[in-house]
Amino acid sequence: MSQLWVLYETYCQLFSLTNEEKVIVIGNQLEHHVTVSSFSFRNGYIQIEKKSDGSTLAVLQGGRQIGELKPRCSITIDVDGQQMTIAWSGEEQRKYVYYVGQQSEVLVSNDPQADIETTNARFSLRKHRGQWVVIPDDDAPLFLNGVQLSDAVSLRNGDVLLCPYMQFVFIEEDLLAVTSSEEVVSSLTETMPPLSEMKKKYPMYRRTPRMIYELPSDKVSISFPSQEGDGDPRGLWLMVLPPVMMLLVIGAVALIQPRGVFIMISIAMFATTIVTSTAQYMREKKARQMRKEKRRRIYTNYLEQKREELQALSEKQRNVLYYHFPSFEQMKSFVMQVNSRIWERTAESADFLHVRIGTADVPATYEVSVSMGDLANREIDDLLEQAQHIAKVYQTVKHVPLPIDVSHGAIGMVGKRSIVNGEIEQLVGQIAFFHSYHDVRFVAIFSEDDYKHWEWMKWLPHFQLPNSFAKGLIYNEQTRDQLLSSIYEMLRERALDEEKDKKRFSPHFVFIVADRSLIAEHVILEYLEEKNEDIGISVIFASETKESLTENVHTLVQYINEREGEIVIQHRKAAHIPFQLDEHSTEGNESFARMLRSLNHQKGMSNSIPEKVTFLEMMQTRRANELQIVQNWLSCQTSRSLAVPIGLKGRNDVVELNLHEKAHGPHGLVAGTTGSGKSELLQTYILSLAVHFHPHEVAFLIIDYKGGGMAQPFKNMPHLLGTITNIHGSKNFSARALASINSELKKRQRLFDRYEVNHINDYMELYKQGKAEQPLPHLFLIADEFAELKSEEPDFIRELVSAARIGRSLGVHLILATQKPRGVIDEQIWSNARFRISLKMQDVNDSKEILRNGDAAAITVPGRAYLQVGNNEVYELFQSAWSGAPYVEEGVEAEDEIHIVTDLGLVPVSNVATDRKRSRQKPKTEIEMVVEQIIETQKQLNIEKLPSPWLPPLPPRLARPASVTAEANAFPIGLKDEPELQSQSDYFYQWLEDGNIGIFGSAGYGKSTTMMTLLLSFAGAYNPAQLHYYIFDFGNSALLPLRQLPHTADYFRLDDEKKIEKFIKFMKEEMEQRKQRFMEKEVSTIKLYNALSEEKLPIIIVALDNFDVVKEEMPDFETQLIQYARDGQSLGIFFIMTATRVSGIRPPLMNNLKTKIVHYFIDSSEKFSLIGRTPYDVDPIPGRALIKKDNAALTQIYLPADGEDDIEVLENVKREMERLKEVYQHIPKPKPIPMLPPRLSMSVFTNTYVQHRASGFIPVGLDEQTVRPVAINMRTDPHCLIVGQSRKGKTNVVKVILESLLVQEPESIGLLDGIDRGLAGYANRDDITYIEAKERLAQWLNEADAVLQQREREYIQAVNENRATTLAWPPVVFVVDSLLRLQQETDSIMQGRIANMMKQYSHLGFHVFVAGNANEFVKGFDALTAELKQIRQAILVTKKSEQSLFALPFTRNEQEIEPGFGYFVVGGKDQKIQIPKVE
C-alpha cells in the first residue's frame, strides 16, 4: 500500500492508496477522499488517477491533466493562488520498531553518524524529565499530527511525526516506530513491541478467569492473663511485731521478776521466731517476684504471637481491598496495557457495582474475641490492658479502600459541586473499568453548562444506549425529549414484566442525576425516585444539599471538603463513616474512555465468527450480476435438497439451512428479540432460496400479521405469491388466510389425484417431463410475529400448524418467527418444528423456551444466532448474512457511509460510491439489487409468475364500474371475495330474478350509499319509460340527489303524510290494473307480459331508506308495504329498503326480501339473526357487506361514483345524473303522485290546471286526491249554493265563479254584493250588472225575464220541431254574495219572483249562485228559501258537521277546514277541493 502526501499552507495530510482505488479526489467536501476546506477549487477539484501501467499517477484539474507523479516524486500546483504540493511514495511502506529506552537523544538526519540515517528528514529527539521532546530543523519541514512544527514540542505516545515519505510514532516511552517507503539505516536496536495476550488480540477482548481473593474471616481469640497472685497481706513488721512485743514483755518481766532459765528459753524462742519469720518473708517475696516476671514474660510472648497473627490478617484484608478496589488512576494504567482485569466483574459477581469512594478505617472482616471473664472480681493490670489494646487496634483496618454498593436503588452524593463532579468521574471510571458494556449502561443527566466536564465520558462504550448510536448524555431539552422517552419505555416494559422478580434484566442501567430540574416534569422520575430495585436500575443523585434528594435514597455520601467525606446513611441506617478522598486528575480520562471504546468485548464461542457478513460476502461475490442465478435455477433440484446458505460460522465456513424433509425440515421456528436481526435473517433466507431455485420450484407466502414490511423488498419477485397481512385489523384475517391456504392444499391434492402421485417431488418430475401442465413449487409459509398473531388469533395458528402438518408431502413448509417465544410455543408447534433458530433472546427463560437451554440469552451481536435441528443433531452458532447492507460495486469497502457522530446518534453525511452522481442519492441495498437481478433473469427466461393463493383484502373504497346494458340483465354491485376459490370477482344482481332487496347495518356503514349504487346502476341501463323510482327518504336525506334522476317519479319525506296516503292508493290501483292486464294476456310475470305485449309496462322500484321509522310511526303503511312486497314482484314492482335493526322488519316482509345485503352491525347478533352463521364477519368498513341470496358472499359494495372522498363522490353522482338527464331528455318522465300546490292562485289554476274549458262548466277548484279541476256542471245542476260561516272564503268562491263565468261570455250576470261590499271591484265591469238597490234588482229581473221568455218561446217551437237538443244559450246568471242581504233588500213578492224564475227558466240558461250562512238557508219558510233548499249542488267552506242542508258523512273529531279549501257537494256526495285565490 503506497501513500499520497498532500502539503498545503502549514498542514500535511496522508492518504493510503489501495489497489482498488482508481481515482482519488482532493476537494473541499466531506465526501472527497482528501478534504481541504480552506481551498475554493474554483477551477475544479484535483483528481489523481492511476495509469494502466500502475507506475505513474496522472494529476488532473477540472478534467484537464496538469501533471504526472512518479514514485518518490512530488508536484506543486497553484490552486486559486495558493500552493499545494502532492507527493507519492510509490512503493509499499515498511515498518521498523526501535528500542530507545537507554537513549537520551535520537538524531535523525543524513549524517552517517546519526542514529537514524535518512535523506528525507532532519530533526532530533531528546528525553527531558522522562518525556521525549522533538526539536525540528529549520531547513527540513516536519509535521506533528498534520501541523507543521516550528519549535520544540513534548510528545505523547501515539503522536505522529510526518516528513516526506516517512512517519515516526512513539508506541511506548521506549519504543519508536518508523514507517518508510525506503530502507532505513539505524544504529538503534530493532525489536518487536512486547504484546500481552490481550494486546495480541486487540481490539478483540474476552474475559479471562477472574482471580478473586477472599477477605479473611478467621476467628482470633485472645485470652486474658491469669490473675496476678496476691502477695502476703501482712508486712514484715506484722510478722515480727508479735514476737518482738512478747520479747519486750518477757524482758520487762525478767527485769521485774527474773525467772532464770524460763526467761532465757522464752527469749531464745521469740528471737528464733523473729529470725525465721524474717527469713520466710524474704524468701516468699523473692518467689512472688519470680512468678510475676514469669507471668509477664509468657503472656507478652503470647500477645506478640497474636499481634503477628492479627497483623497478617489485617494486611491480607488490606491487600484484598486494594486489589479488588484499585484507584481510578491505577485503572487508567491498566486500560492502556489492556490488562486482563478489564471488565472482570459480571452481573453474577458478589461485588457487582461495588465501587471505591475513598479510603477509611474499616471494620476487620476477621473476628477478634477477648476472653473477658469476670472483670468485676479482678484488678486491671498492664498485661490485661495490653491485650485489650491489641484487640481494639486490630478490630479495624486503617486506610484501606472504602466501597459502597450502587447495584440497586438510589444513593445520594452531597457536597460542593466541583467536588461531587470529580468523585462521579471516579465512580464512572471504576464501573466502566470493571463492568462490561454488555452488563452495565450509563445515563447521565446534567446541566449543559457542565458539558465540558462530562464530555470525555461519551467515549465510554457504556454510555451508548442499547440498539442505538445515541449516547446516554441528557443535558438539554432536545436530548431529554429524544432519548428519555425510549429509555422510559424500556423501563416500563421491565416494570410490567410479570416475572421481573425471577429474572435479572440486562443491561443494568446506572442513572447519574446531577441536574434534577431537567427531568422534573418527566414521567421517568416515577422509576428513578421510587423503590424499583427489581427492574435493573441504579440511581446516583448528586446535589449540593441533601434536602434536594428523594426519600428513597438508601445510601448518602457527604463530601466535607476536597480531602474528607462521610457516609452519613448506609442501607437506610445512620452510619457516619468518615473517609479520605482519593487523589485523581482529569488527565488521561479521555484516553481511558477511548481505549475502552476501542475494545470489542466478545462473549461465548465467537472467536472465528465474523461480526458482520453481508449477503454478497456470504455468496463470495461483490456484484449482484455475478450471482449464478440462471445456472442455479437450471441445476438446483428441490427433490434432492433445499439447502441454501444463511450465514457463516467461521471466516469461510458457510452455514446452510435445508428444509428438505430428510434434512432440517420441513418446518421450524425462528426467535429473536427486538434488534436481534430476526427479520433480516428471514429476508436473507428468502433471498437465498430465490437465488438458488427456480420460481416454479420454490415460492413464498409471507404472513406478516401487522404489516411490518418484511415482505416489501420482495414485492415484485416472481417467487413471492403474496403477503397475508392484517394491517387494517380485519376480523376475517384468520378465516381468509386459512381459506386461502386450505384452497391451495386442496388444489394440490386434486392435481396429485389427477396424476396419481402422492408426493410433490413425483409431481414435479411429471411436470418437467411435460406430462403435467401446471407447476407446483415448494410453498414456504413464513409467519412473522406469530406470538402476537397467536394471542389475537389462536385458532388461526392452530389450524395453520395443522394444515402445514397435512401439507408435508404436498410441498408446504412452515416457518414461525417471534420475538417472545415464552407461552406461545405449545406442544403442537414444538413437535412440528424440526429446526429452531434463536437469535438474541431477552433472558434465559426465553432462550430455554426455544433451545431448551439459556445460550441465546448471552448473544450480544445483532445477527448472531444458534441453529438447532432435532434433539441437538445440529447445534451451531453462526452469524447470519445481512442482505440489507448498502450495495457497493466499487470503492473502499470500509467506507459504506460517512456519518457525523453526535450525542443523539449518527447523522449521515453522504454515501460513498465511485459514481459521483450516485453518491448524492440514497444507495440501494444488496437485497434490492439481488431482487432486481432475479426479476431481470425472470424476464430473460420469459418465466410466467404463478397465480397467488392469497388475494389481497377487499379495498375499503371501490368505484362503480361503467354501466352495463339492459340486455345483460345483471348488474355488478360490488367486488365479491372468495378466498376458498382463490377468486375475487364482481357480484351481480340478476335483474328481475333476485327480487326485493333488504339492506341492513348499523348507522354510518353504507346502507344508503349501497341503495344509491343500485339505483344508479339500474338507471344507467334502463330509460325512464322502462323504469320508475319512488324514493322514500326517511333517513338523513342521503337519497336526495336521486330526486333529480329522470327515472324518479316521486320523492317522499317522512312528513309527507298525504302524499304517502296517495301513494298507497296509487299502488293499489296500479297493481289492480296490472293484474287485469296480465289476465288479459294470460301471463303471470312482468317478464312474460312485456315479451308478449306491444305496450310495455315499466318496472317500478320502491326505494325506502330507514324502514325502522315505518314500523315505529307508520303501522298502516307497513301493512300495505308487506302486501305490496308479497304481490308486487311478479307484477314488476320491487322494493329496496334499508334498516338498522332486524326487528324493524316483520317476518312476513322479511320473507319477501329475496336478496339481503348485510353491512356491519355493532351488535353481532343482528347479523346472525339475518343470515345465520357465516365463515366471515363484516368488518366495520363503510360498504363492506355480506350478500345473502342462496349463500353469503363477503363483498365490498361499489361506490355510486368515483371519488377520493364523499364530497367528490357526491359531485360525480350529480354529474352522472346530469348525463342521464341529457341522454333521456326526449323520453317523458314518469308521473309523480299528484299533490295540491301549497298556494293556488287563480292565474295558476286557469293556466296550469284548467287546460280545456267546456261550455256549461265552471271550474271552481282542484280535487285533493286527483289534483284535477272540479267544475260546476250548469247543464245538470243549474244552481249552486256557497255555504260557510263569516270570513271563511265564501266571497272568494263567488269571485272564482264570476271569473269562470266571464270567460264563457254570458248573456247577463246580475251581482248582488254582500253587506261588506267584497265584490265592489266588479261594479264597473260592462258584462256584470252590479245591483245596489231593490229597484235595480227589479230592473235586472225584468230584463232577464224578457230574455228568458223569448227563449221559452224558441224552446217550445224547437220542441215542436224535435230539435230541442240543439238549442244552446249563453247563461243568464244571478249571483248573490249574501243571502241575508237579499232577504233584507227584497220583499216576499220579489223573492217569490226569483223562486219562480228558478223553477221556470233553469232549463233555459238561468242560473242562481247564492252564498250564505248555513242557518240562513234553513231557518226561513218563504218561497225563495224553500227553492234554495232544493238545490243539491253546493260548495261548502265550513265543516260538514256544521251544516244540515246536506246529509254528508263526517268523523266525530272532524278538523277545521283549512283556508283555501272546501267541499264540493253534488248529488249527496262530497269531495274536498282546493279553491284558487282570486287576488
Curated annotation (Swiss-Prot):
GO molecular function, one term: ATP binding
Regulation: EsxB binding to the third FtsK domain causes multimerization; a subsequent unknown step relieves the allosteric inhibition of linker 2 on FtsK domain 1, activating the ATPase activity.
Residues forming coiled coils: 291-321
Keyword Transport attached: yes
Residues engaged in binding ATP 2: G1004, Y1005, G1006, K1007, S1008, T1009, N1036, D1105, I1197, D1206
Principal subcellular localisation of the protein: membrane
Residues engaged in binding ATP 3: R1287, K1288, G1289, K1290, T1291, I1475
UniProt topology in membrane: Multi-pass membrane protein
Residues holding ATP 1: G672, T673, T674, G675, S676, G677, K678, S679
SMART domains: AAA
UniProt xrefs under InterPro entries: AAA+_ATPase (IPR003593), Firmicutes_EssC_C (IPR023839), Firmicutes_EssC_N (IPR022206), FtsK/SpoIIIE/SftA (IPR050206), FtsK_dom (IPR002543), P-loop_NTPase (IPR027417)
Side Extracellular, residues: 257-259
Transmembrane portions of the chain: 236-256, 260-280
GO cellular component, one term: plasma membrane
Active-site residues from the entry: E785
Keyword Ribonucleoprotein: no
Residue intervals of the FtsK domain: 652-848, 984-1168, 1267-1444
Side Cytoplasmic, residues: 1-235, 281-1479
Subcellular location per the Swiss-Prot or TrEMBL entry: Cell membrane
Subunit structure, interactors included: Whole protein oligomerizes in native gels. Part of the ESX / type VII secretion system (T7SS), which is composed of cytosolic and membrane components. The ESX membrane complex is composed of EccB, EccC and EccD.
PANTHER family assigned: SPORULATION PROTEIN RELATED, TYPE VII SECRETION SYSTEM PROTEIN ESSC
Functional description taken from the UniProt entry: Part of the ESX specialized secretion system, which exports proteins from the cell including EsxA (ESAT-6) and EsxB (CFP-10). Might be the translocase subunit. Probably only the first FtsK domain can hydrolyze ATP.
Domain-related comment: The cytoplasmic domain is a rigid structure with 4 domains (residues 480 to 599 form an unnamed domain) plus the 3 FtsK (ATPase) domains which are connected by short linkers.
Protein name (record): ESX secretion system protein EccC
